From Swiss-Prot:
UniProt keyword list: Cytoplasm, FAD, Flavoprotein, Methyltransferase, Multifunctional enzyme, Oxidoreductase, S-adenosyl-L-methionine, Transferase, tRNA processing
Cellular compartments per GO CC: cytoplasm
Protein name: tRNA 5-methylaminomethyl-2-thiouridine biosynthesis bifunctional protein MnmC
Record's function text: Catalyzes the last two steps in the biosynthesis of 5-methylaminomethyl-2-thiouridine (mnm(5)s(2)U) at the wobble position (U34) in tRNA. Catalyzes the FAD-dependent demodification of cmnm(5)s(2)U34 to nm(5)s(2)U34, followed by the transfer of a methyl group from S-adenosyl-L-methionine to nm(5)s(2)U34, to form mnm(5)s(2)U34.
Gene Ontology process terms (BP): methylation; tRNA wobble uridine modification
Annotated stretches, region: FAD-dependent cmnm(5)s(2)U34 oxidoreductase: 260-655
Co-factor(s): FAD
Organism of this sequence: Paraburkholderia phymatum (strain DSM 17167 / CIP 108236 / LMG 21445 / STM815) (Burkholderia phymatum)
Segments of this protein annotated with the region tRNA (mnm(5)s(2)U34)-methyltransferase: 1-236
Length: 655
């Protein structure tokens, strides 16, 4: 179960140095935080020279604290004309500051005007204080800060990246011994790239021994300020110390990808790849984007809450928060999707659930800006209509028009996107280092080293996968005219959903009809939608007094789902190679599986495409580029398209 996140408490020494009462230690040297960061961590890792002329450089830090090391590294990157194309800075933090305390801490320590401006950008982007991985982008996506909130002892083993430099900057070993244990250094060794370097202000004997045991060489150099010595070194193991090598970029001759399908999954992939400079050819069987399930007039977005903070809750939390940041970035760049005001209300299934979830929110200490428990009276005031029970409010949840989001993402891709409509992909074939896509007539359409299958129900068939089965779920939604009933002030979900559109129409839905191919609107489905919503919002039954079901309009679309209700996101397995080696792979883990170089998928999003799509696209782009993953590895493995193949291999049923 996830541990509650406990924010840092900011205090100051008499000399004005930021100080942690919890660890009885200072956040940086009294001589100066900026100078310490430059001397210890940049010069200690031979930066900026080591990142020059490189496409990608990754720093991993233990202990983000005030963010001084990140700010100084960012400033050095900005000042270097030979800087790397993309700088990833990944940092763990068990006790992050609130935004207000972060501002106070940096204001006390940052006198340099240029770095103060960067500190302001950091504060403006500061994430909600909830456990997990938070990816923030600066410099138009060329500087990426990935914050991992939680105990580093637990979170470091969940990261997947190739580090070029380590900043070992927790509180001193005698004040915070848990961050300097052999287990922590073993986790770092698992992520170290070739010739990765490290620097740390300490020269403790225990730290030296732990570094050596993990495969690092060290040397003692002059310390900063009043410290006599510090350690620098590199990863140079004398023998193999890990089962899997950290990730590398996909070896391609050209940065060109084909994206099949232009719904939420495909358009998000287009945006994330073109943001990295990839050229993308999109193939769509319809005449425009977002014509299948992504074509609904609006969709709600919110995380899933559970009493044990399940895998599903953790993934939807990450996806929800990442999507909000990405949509804001699109708007900042002038590509504005249509979305409603912030706020979404979820009504509990019964009073027992309402009480249980209120207790859960308190025990996890979820911040009120993320989710807040509400009584029935609170809910009625928020919704501006009668409700059956209390529940919980997502202040930043809401609704968005999926088609407008898809259009905005394609606009953001600019000239790097070539769009082809009315093309139905039928199969792919490998020729040397390229994948060729063929249409239904057997004609070759386009080739590229990378293909992303974002075509829902057709993905497994076109990709030739046998262990990625999905099912179709018919969903009919109902549009209630403005004169049919009073609309709630904001989206309300629970037993179905009621969503107030901008024109006074209320969108309700949606049915869940497994393996039902009927595309026609059905009166019975309209009745089902209204009755279900009326269990949350009793006044919705008034719609029957104004309009007969046969007079109502709506839309039918088909969700694509898996048996575990999680999407398929990531690299495809080479199923034939895996089955040939089934005996060796009976105890395999996801990283053991052979992969089909260049084939990736983003499909089976069910009813949560708005939450899954942006994060899934970022995960795939990171896998392709060899960048740090934007979520914990166990969460990515829960989404792995090869998970059902892996299950069959473990059970001895793969053939």
């Amino acid at each position: 179960m996830t541990d509650p996140l406990v924010p840092a408490v900011l205090a100051f020494r008499d000399n004005g140095t930021p100080y942690s009462p919890l660890y009885d230690d200072i956040y940086h040297s009294a001589v100066g935080g900026l100078a310490q960061a430059d001397y210890v961590f940049l010069k200690g890792n031979d930066l900026p020279s080591r990142w020059q002329k490189r496409r990608l450089f990754t720093v991993l830090e233990t202990g983000f604290g005030m963010g001084i090391n990140f700010l100084v590294t960012w400033a050095a990157w900005r000042a270097d004309p030979d800087r790397c194309e993309r700088l990833h800075f990944v940092s763990t933090e068990k006790h992050p500051f609130s935004r207000e305390d972060l501002i106070a801490a940096t204001n006390s320590s940052v006198a340099d005007a240029s770095i103060a401006a960067l500190a302001e950008q950091l504060a403006n982007a500061w994430p909600t204080l909830v456990p997990g991985t938070h990816r923030l982008e600066f410099e138009e996506g060329r500087v990426i800060l990935t914050l991992v909130f939680g105990d580093a002892v637990q979170t470091l083993p969940t990261l997947w990246l190739r580090a070029d430099a380590f900043y070992l900057d927790g509180f001193s070993p005698d004040r915070n011994p848990d961050l300097w244990t052999p287990a922590v250094f073993k986790s770092l060794a698992r992520l170290a790239g070739d010739e990765a370097t490290f620097a740390t202000y300490t020269s403790s004997g225990d730290v030296k021994r732990s570094l050596q045991q993990a495969g690092f060489e060290y040397r003692k150099v002059d310390g900063f300020g009043w410290k006599r010595a510090m350690l620098v070194g590199r990863f140079a193991p004398r023998y193999r110390v890990r089962r899997h090598e950290p990730p590398l970029p996909l070896a391609v001759g050209e940065r060109h990808a084909i994206v099949i399908g232009t719904g939420l999954a495909g358009c998000a992939a287009i945006e994330r790849l073109t943001a990295r400079g990839w050229r993308v050819t999109s193939l769509e069987r319809h005449a425009d984007v977002a014509r299948d399930a992504s074509g609904n007039p609006a969709g709600v977005f919110h995380p899933m809450m559970s009493r044990d903070d399940s895998v599903g809750s953790r993934i939807t939390r990450a996806g929800f928060l990442y999507a909000l940041r990405q949509w804001s970035a699109l708007e900042h760049r002038g590509h504005r999707p249509l979305r409603g005001p912030e706020g979404l209300l979820q009504i509990a299934a019964d009073e027992e659930e309402a009480l249980a979830m209120a207790h859960t929110f308190a025990s996890f200490a979820w911040p009120r800006e993320y989710v807040v428990s509400v009584t029935r009276d609170d809910a009625e005031r928020i919704a501006n209509m009668r409700v059956a029970r209390g529940g919980w409010l997502f202040p930043h949840g809401g609704w968005i028009d999926p088609a407008s989001l898809c259009a905005a993402q394609c606009e953001a891709a600019g000239g790097l996107l070539e769009r082809r409509f009315n093309v139905a992909a039928a199969r792919v074939e490998r020729l040397e280092n390229q994948w060729i896509v063929f249409d239904e007539n057997g004609a070759a359409v386009v080739s590229a080293p990378v293909v992303i299958f974002a075509n829902a129900h057709e993905a497994a068939r076109v990709a030739g996968l046998h262990y990625a089965s999905t099912r179709s779920v018919r969903g009919q939604l109902t549009l209630l005219p403005a004169d049919a009933t009073n609309a709630p002030r904001l989206p309300v979900i629970g037993e179905g959903y009621a969503l107030p559109l901008l024109d006074g129409v209320t969108l309700t839905g949606a049915t869940y009809d497994i393996d039902d191919p009927d595309t026609r609107l059905r009166d019975g489905a309209h009745i089902e939608n209204i009755e279900r919503v009326a269990q949350m919002l009793p006044d919705m039954r008034d719609a029957f007094n104004v309009h007969a079901p046969s007079s109502l309009t709506g839309r039918v679309a088909f969700r694509c789902v898996t048996s575990d209700r999680l999407p398929m996101i990531g690299a495809f397995a080479d199923e034939a190679a895996a089955i040939r080696d089934a005996g060796k792979l009976c105890g395999a883990w996801p990283l053991d599986l052979p992969r089909a170089d260049g084939l990736y998928g983003a499909f089976a999003f069910g009813s949560r495409g708005l939450v899954w799509a942006s994060l899934g696209a970022e995960l795939m782009a990171s896998q392709i580029e060899g960048e740090p993953w934007p979520i914990e590895r166990d969460l990515a493995e829960a989404l792995d398209p090869a998970r059902f193949l892996l299950r069959a291999l473990r059970q001895g049923t793969a053939s």
